[in-house]
Every structure is written in structure tokens, then in C-alpha cells.
């Protein structure tokens, strides 16, 4: 049994994250060779590589078998492809969180190709028609949360979580990665990455830290009167 460094109430979320990655690895095993999965696990090839022939578009595969289920694992609800309120703007993020205090937009890229979406997520955040200071950019392996930078005139990464070591650990457990390809350090880091993912993205924790990170005047725009953790914000001005 994995000794998660989490409160007991968060154990189901951590197990759900681990199971999602395991299921994704098994889906990959139906589409790719073991050597290709090992390269994907260690980031030496992208799922968008033209030499890989999948039954889906690489971005759709990443979303359907990894990103959607990881969001579910941490109790985040979402709606696909929200549209800007202005008819003059034709920009469509891949999803928008719908059960968080702040409605966060998100962009998905194929596994190991997260940087390809950086310009897009910044564009979405610059649109006044999306009422959010935050955006998530992910390829399933790496999760970046963008928010206002210190100058207040742009956007920067506020939080960043990787799941590559967790992917490697689970692929090894499924006998897809060889014994020589995994160290005990990677295994320890894999468990830590799952823990960090839950602590960062579980809905209640996500609400708390995204609110705390905002300046008080902007935070007050989103903070409900009956928010359960409201007293914890008194020291954050």
C-alpha cells in the first residue's frame, strides 16, 4: 500500500490519479510499442510525433484518456470549449472549470508538447470576455497554472506540477519499462508528484490557493460571502 503524505480524506483522490495514469498507460499499450511508451514516459518523444499512428488525433487521445480523468480525480468539473461572450472574438479554450470559485479556462496539448500552447493560454487570459485571471495549460504530463504577474500587466506561471515520474513508476509496475530504466529516486518522486497534484488541484485546495494568490481587491470580486475558508484570508492583503 502506498504511504501517501496526505490527509486520509485525500487518499481516494490520490488513488484515482494513480488509476487514471495506469489506465492511460494501458491505452497506450494498445496503440504503441513498449519502446515508444518508454520514450513517451521519459519525454524523448511527443505523442504528436508524425511517426506515431494512433486511432485518435494526439490531442484528443491525451484529453480523452488522461486529462479528463485527472480532472475528475480531483473533483474538478468542467465544460468543453467555452466561447467568448463577444461575438467579435473567435477564441475557444479546450475547457473551463465550472465548480471552482474562479472560473478557470484551460488548454490541452498532446503529451510532451505542453509548450506549444503557451501563446494560446496567454491569448485567452488577455480577453476581457473570459472572466478569469487564471488559465491551465496541460499535456497531461505537465500542468501549468498561469495567473497575473507581479507587474499586473501580463501573465506568468503561478504553479507547475509534473507527473512524469509517476508515469514512469506506473509504466514500470505494468512491466512496460525495464528494471534498469527506473531508480528508487524516481519511484519516490512519482509518489510525491501524485501527492503534489492532489494538493494543488483538488477542488477545495485549488480554490484556496488561487484566491489567496490574488490581491485583496481582485480576490473580493470572486469570494462568496459564505465561503467556508473565508477566515483564512484575513492575513492575506
Listing of model-derived features with the role each one plays in the protein:
Residues 1-134, 142-237:
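A short, conserved, highly charged catalytic patch centered on acidic carboxylates
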Amino acid at each position: 500500500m502506498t504511504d501517501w503524505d496526505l490527509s486520509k480524506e485525500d487518499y481516494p483522490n490520490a488513488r484515482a490519479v494513480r488509476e487514471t495514469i495506469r489506465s492511460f498507460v494501458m491505452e497506450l499499450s494498445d496503440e504503441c510499442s513498449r519502446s515508444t511508451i518508454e520514450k513517451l514516459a521519459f519525454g524523448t518523444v511527443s505523442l504528436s510525433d508524425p511517426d506515431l499512428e494512433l486511432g485518435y488525433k494526439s490531442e484528443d487521445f491525451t484529453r480523452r484518456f488522461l486529462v479528463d480523468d485527472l480532472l475528475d480525480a480531483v473533483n474538478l468539473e468542467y465544460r468543453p470549449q467555452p466561447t467568448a461572450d463577444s461575438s467579435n472574438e473567435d477564441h475557444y479554450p479546450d475547457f473551463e472549470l465550472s465548480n471552482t470559485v474562479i472560473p478557470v479556462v484551460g488548454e490541452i496539448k498532446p503529451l510532451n508538447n505542453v509548450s506549444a500552447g503557451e501563446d494560446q493560454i496567454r491569448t485567452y487570459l488577455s480577453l476581457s470576455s473570459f472572466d478569469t485571471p487564471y488559465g491551465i495549460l496541460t499535456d497531461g504530463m505537465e500542468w501549468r497554472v498561469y495567473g497575473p504577474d507581479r507587474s499586473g500587466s501580463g501573465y506568468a506561471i503561478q504553479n507547475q506540477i509534473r507527473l512524469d515520474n509517476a508515469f514512469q513508476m506506473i509504466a514500470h509496475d505494468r512491466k512496460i519499462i525495464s528494471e534498469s530504466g527506473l531508480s528508487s529516486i524516481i519511484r519516490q518522486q512519482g509518489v510525491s508528484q501524485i501527492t503534489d497534484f492532489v494538493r494543488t488541484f483538488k477542488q477545495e485546495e485549488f480554490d484556496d490557493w488561487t484566491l489567496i494568490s490574488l490581491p485583496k481587491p481582485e480576490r473580493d470580486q470572486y469570494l462568496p460571502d459564505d465561503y467556508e475558508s473565508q477566515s483564512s484570508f484575513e492575513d492575506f492583503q
